[in-house]
């Protein structure tokens, strides 16, 4: 017998796969049908719900890019100039605290979306190079943020391709780099971390926020990197690709690349005892 939506909501507390401005954690019937198989087992006088992920597959960056191009207009409208409540209340404050932007900075904005965080930095007189691998998203970002053209340069680049990333190098190194909720959307993050290290000045700062792999990815295969389809904002045209990695995979990649982590937050939204995201500050050190 299928478990009810109410039982799953009680069991899970939240689903961070559905985010909108006013109701960030909603388990929809579509998600239940598409993503989870629920089985009943005896549990005293009640019921116990066991969740299992659907078939684990590796979705390609080409599939992911096509989906983001299809979702771009919806995403631009949904995030707007100021982003949604989740980003404004949970992501942005600690990201900005760790990034500590200054007018003297030259910041790389990774997977910039419609550019609203780049605009936030530009308001602080920061110079920004912002990129995304969705051509449609970059087109919309340029249009939406055209009033900041003197502070923001928008580019199309592939975060999984070191050659594409190193083409972002300009006459001066970046002082800082930032990624707001994008690491979980990227097929292979090793080229990104390697390139960011090379593009940053000595002692440069890399701040990234991503889904908390312990509490958000609803899977029994925590230690195994894998990918799956889900939605980020309710009503988006296409489900996007997510890429799960354990904390040790993420942290060890930082260390192996040459970064030292000197700032870390676990931030909550719906349930104040269950963090939805991690925010990491990594400092480039000489190898």
Question: What are the residue ranges of the model-derived segments?
Answer:
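A short acidic, Gly/Pro-enriched loop at the edge of an enzyme's catalytic core
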Residues: 165-177
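A short SAM/SAH-binding and catalytic strip from SAM-dependent methyltransferases
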Residues: 175-189
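Conserved class I S-adenosyl-L-methionine
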Residues: 50-102, 116, 120, 140, 207-233, ...
């Amino acid at each position: 017998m299928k478990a009810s939506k109410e039982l799953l909501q009680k069991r899970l507390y939240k689903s961070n796969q559905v985010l909108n401005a006013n109701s960030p954690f909603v388990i929809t019937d579509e998600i239940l049908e598409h993503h989870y198989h629920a089985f009943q087992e005896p549990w005293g006088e009640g019921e116990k719900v066991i969740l299992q992920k659907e078939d684990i597959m590796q979705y390609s960056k080409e599939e992911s890019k096509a989906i983001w191009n299809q979702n771009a207009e919806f995403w631009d409208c949904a995030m707007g100039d100021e982003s949604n409540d989740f980003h404004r209340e949970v992501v942005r404050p600690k990201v900005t605290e760790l990034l500590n932007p200054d007018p003297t900075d030259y910041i790389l904005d990774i997977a910039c979306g419609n550019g609203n965080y780049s605009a936030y930095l530009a308001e602080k007189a920061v110079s920004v190079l912002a990129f995304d691998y969705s051509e449609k998203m970059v087109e919309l970002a340029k249009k939406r943020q055209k009033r900041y053209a003197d502070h923001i340069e928008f580019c199309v680049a592939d975060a999984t391709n070191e050659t594409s990333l190193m083409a972002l190098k300009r006459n001066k190194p970046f002082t800082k780099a930032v990624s707001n909720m994008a690491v979980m959307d990227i097929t292979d993050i090793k080229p990104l971390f390697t390139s960011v290290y090379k593009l940053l000045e000595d002692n440069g700062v890399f701040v990234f926020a991503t889904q908390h792999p312990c509490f958000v990815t609803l899977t029994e295969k925590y230690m195994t990197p894998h990918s799956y389809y889900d939605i980020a904002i309710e009503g988006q045209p296409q489900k996007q690709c997510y890429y799960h990695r354990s904390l040790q995979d993420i942290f060890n990649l930082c260390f192996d690349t040459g970064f030292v982590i000197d700032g870390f937050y676990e931030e909550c939204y719906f349930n104040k005892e269950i963090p939805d995201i991690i925010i990491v500050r990594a400092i480039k050190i000489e190898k």
